[in-house]
Amino acid sequence: MKPLHLKLNNFGPFLKEEIDFSKIDNNELFLISGKTGSGKTMIFDAMTYALFGKASTEQREENDLRSHFADGKQPMSVTFEFQLNHRIYKVHRQGPYIKEGNTTKTNAKFDVFEMVDGKYEIRESKVISGTQFIIELLGVNADQFRQLFILPQGEFKRFLISNSREKQGILRTLFDSEKFEAIREILKEEVKKEKAQIENRYQQIDLLWQEIESFDDDNIKGLLGVATQQIDKLIENIPLLQARSKEILASVNESKETAIKEFEIIEKKTLENNILKDNINQLNKNKIDFVQLKEQQPEIEGIEAKLKLLQDITNLLNYIENREKIETKIANSKKDISKTNNKILNLDCDKRNIDKEKKMLEENGDLIESKISFIDKTRVLFNDINKYQQSYLNIERLRTEGEQLGDELNDLIKGLETVEDSIGNNESDYEKIIELNNTITNINNEINIIKENEKAKAELDKLLGSKQELENQINEETSILKNLEIKLDRYDKTKLDLNDKESFISEIKSAVNIGDQCPICGNEIQDLGHHIDFDSIAKRQNEIKEIEANIHAIKSNIAVHNSEIKFVNEKISNINIKTQSDFSLEVLNKRLLENENALNNQRDLNKFIEQMKEEKDNLTLQIHNKQLRLNKNESELKLCRDLITEFETLSKYNNITNFEVDYKKYVQDVNQHQELSKEIEDKLMQLSQRKLIEQNNLNHYENQLETYNNDLELNEQSIEMEMSRLNLTDDNDIDEIIAWRGEQEELEQKRDTYKKRYHEFEMEIARLESLTKDKELLDSDKLKDEYELKKGKMNTLIDEYSAVHYQCQNNINKTQSIVSHINYLNQELKDQQEIFQLAEIVGGKNNKNLTLENFVLIYYLDQIIAQANLRLATMSDNRYQLIRREAVSHGLSGLEIDVFDLHSNKSRHISSLSGGETFQSSLALALGLSEIVQQQSGGISLESIFIDEGFGTLDQETLETALDTLLNLKSTGRMVGIISHVSELKNRIPLVLEVKSDQYQSSTRFKRN
């Protein structure tokens, strides 16, 4: 991610400010400089806020970012443009605020744009989704962004000096290692659940074992006495338990079957005796009822005689009924014949009236034909009547418009001639403008060279003066140094090494005597007197130390002056006095003014000519358009004339309205005539068809009447023959028999019921006699008592068997469940053993007492330290290396960092480093952290890094090394920005972003040293 442009409104001390990072060439190192409180860090806050809605430091809240001097009606907003993977994006974030005069807060806004084909297209327009889009785009969240892109105040060395728990929190955020802690918790819960399930399964086994029925059997009680924790013993006893239960069930079943057989015997005997008793009673009752039924025999015989006579007279009755129907049909046919004759007469009358109407209509035929001819000839005119009507309406307008267009065209042609006369032979001369611009540029360059040379000469004189002054100081100090060295050489340095040996010599003297052998030199001791003046030796030694101290101080001063002379010489060598023009500044300025005036005059002339050409082109275009409109007008006018001529020729009318009225009237008359003619023809056709239908109906009715008369004659003959057969003389005999027909159904039912019951009694008496023949009836009370006794015994044994069978089956189910639980328990213990071991290892119960998360974080920390040591070795002149403290305890340590001093070959606490050494280590670790996070985050594009940390703790050499390190970052393609107050950085870093404050608001500008 590389910043391109930053725009701030009411943000911190910036009311309205823009920073153009595109002025930074080739990712060069640049310095952000300004007084304390001017708003340097706010630049970092703005970038972080624009992307994530947060400041670059955690301590600053969003409400703290709004300027105190902002207009109450204006929002705080940041617009940030940046480049990522060769694509350009822009984000605009507006903070929430309460607008002056309102009581409710105006919500925050956030828009994300991407440049496509030179234009920004919106990608997101909501705060939450937009921020998530940026996180996914950059591949980092706000915390990771602070570690990768911006190293803010107070957090620069936080990672270096933090303890394991604090580092764990930082590394968790950067490497998303909480998932490993989540795995540990999941495994812990899983183990807890599994152990609970295992314990629950033991309880279920115990509960099932206790619920097994013993049937009060000593063998089963002995088997059930085993403890349920002895699952192997349970498996061994279960088959024995099931076998004994089956034996008990078989014994009960045998007693039950015996009782059932005894009950079935007495039940069968009781049932047979009850059936015999019922049959005897039924037989006696049926015999009595059968005698009573036979008493109805004479009545039934009379009914049968009546029914026979009714059956014989049926044919005669049918003939009589048929005679009545035929007589009715004859009467109806006569009525139909009369009605049909009347209808035919009416139809003949209607036809005569319609014939008269037809004759009257045919008398107007010639007039109608002439109207039809007119309609056919002018139909095409009427269908397009609007076209002809419009021609009459437009012809005058088109004549007037044509005359007006002709006049306007003539005026435009005259105007074009005037413009062409103004242009004449003049042409735009842009080459002359380029030539004058080049001349002006050259003159400006010569003027700048003269000014720069004057400034360089003044700087050179100043540096030469400083150099001469330093050389004079060195000469003076060199002379003093020589005198001190001569004085030092003149001192007697003998016996100086005995100055601190006085006590040692006294001890030796007290331990030896004259004549003894000296323990030092081995010679015989001749004298024990004082041969050495220790006071004189101490005095000479102090004087020598003082001279040596002065010599060392003077040498240090000379070295400092030599370093300063070297620095001055470097500055002198960097001063470049360029070759300049022989002309004076006054002459060059005069020439510059002349050329600028000539340039302005030529620009005015070119502008005038271009305006005239533009006006000429405009007039030419207008003339062309007018000519087109005039041509169009003439074409439309000709078309109108042709249409009017066509209309008047075909219609013989010169008025559209009159033509329309007459045409519509003719069409109406023709349509009415044709409709009336068709209506008359339709009526005649209908009358003809109706008369034909009625004539057919009349013939049909007459034929029917003849048929009915013949049928009536034949039916009368049949009646006479049937009465003769039945010996009936008149209609009274027939009426008496007909009266019986109302009772026929009742008589038939009574006869049939008698015959049916008679047959049923015969059958039932025969059946019951066969069932009771040769059978003896037993005592019912005795049978009932014996039946109840056997039934009670059987039910008791059935209930006992059901209970024992259920308990046996229940025992089998429970033992099967126990076996299933035991098998599952054994398999579960086997399967979960690896999970238990894994949970212990992940939870820190291992040889290093490390949780899985800390193991992963240690791996990442080792990589970070290895990357950091590559730079720290250079910055510390191969003295220091960062190392991870190996001590671990219950997974909460192992992330502390110590420093290894290669000079002493020992490691020590990080707090033992000086301020400058701490800065070196912090910078190296921060850069290493940045690179490792980039690698682990899918190759985040780190094209820039900003450091907000003081460099004041560094000495000259360390500062140079730190700058070299940051310059190396530039060579890897990163833009590097630094906030610092160190004056040396202002001299070393050529590009400075100055932040100035007037106590009200701040402003920025880029400048080069």
Swiss-Prot record:
A Pfam family assignment: SbcC_Walker_B
GO biological process, alphabetically ordered: DNA recombination; DNA replication; double-strand break repair
Domain of life: Bacteria
Keywords, alphabetical: ATP-binding, Coiled coil, DNA recombination, DNA replication, Endonuclease, Exonuclease, Hydrolase, Nuclease, Nucleotide-binding
GO molecular function: ATP binding; ATP hydrolysis activity; endonuclease activity; exonuclease activity
UniProt cross-references to InterPro entries, sorted A to Z: P-loop_NTPase, Rad50/SbcC_AAA, SbcCD_Nuclease_C
SUPFAM superfamilies in the cross-refs: P-loop containing nucleoside triphosphate hydrolases, Rad50 coiled-coil Zn hook
Gene3D superfamilies, sorted: P-loop containing nucleotide triphosphate hydrolases
Keyword Methyltransferase: no
Subunit record text: Heterodimer of SbcC and SbcD.
Family from the record: Belongs to the SMC family. SbcC subfamily.
PANTHER family referenced in this protein's UniProt entry, alphabetically: ABC TRANSPORTER ABCH.3 (PTHR32114:SF2)
Record function comment: SbcCD cleaves DNA hairpin structures. These structures can inhibit DNA replication and are intermediates in certain DNA recombination reactions. The complex acts as a 3'->5' double strand exonuclease that can open hairpins. It also has a 5' single-strand endonuclease activity.
Name by which UniProt lists this protein: Nuclease SbcCD subunit C
Gene name for this UniProt entry: sbcC
